[in-house]
Amino acid sequence: MDSLSQYKVLSAPGTVHYLPNFITEAEETSLLAQVARTPSPRWTQLANRRLQNWGGLPHPKGMIAEKMPDWLQTYVNMVNNLGVFGAKEGVDGIKPTLANHVLLNEYHPGQGIMPHLDGPMFHPTISTISLGSHTVINFYKEEGENSSLKFEDRLVTSLLVEPRSLLVLQDEMYHQLLHGIEEIHEDKIDDKICNLDNSTVIGSIIPRKTRISLTIRHVPKTSKMKLKLGR
């Protein structure tokens, strides 16, 4: 994690590391081509986006581990090498905790995801590589006693996530703040975005394109045996 210190977003309310140009344009092009070649049965279609699970399908009873394809494992290794998932002690001594799951989401302009917490099935670190387009991720307080407040009234901060970047969220950014993406076609840059650089102009409008996100995570509870998940 020491190598990440220069990428920490100091104005964020929790632990955020943002690495622009984590991958090259050539790597992005290769990944997008690989995603485009994915057979249609691999996709799960939802109302507002479609997705793929790689490494297994997370479940409260345990994820049945599957081999990660080589075209994804390369980038899983790149994230693992940063040490973002920490380490744990076992019978063979202290070993790094490694990512074993990738959730691939496809968002067209106008699509997004409702504010949510990722929950206890995952190690409390989210690492996401973005391909093809930027997005803005918003972070909100949970309802608490003020359940009548709309999401916009509970907005804490936002992050501008650019193509080819890596975003790492930890601690209260994982446990306490809901994160979501608005279902809009363009993003207006405002002072709620906490990771703006000097080249970004407040008030500018950025049209969205189709975005692929690779959310790389560690699922602690896994099984090599098929589970009887029930109906």
Residue ranges and their predicted role:
Residues 1-231:
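Non-heme Fe(II) oxygenase metal-center motifs and adjacent flexible, charged/small-residue loops
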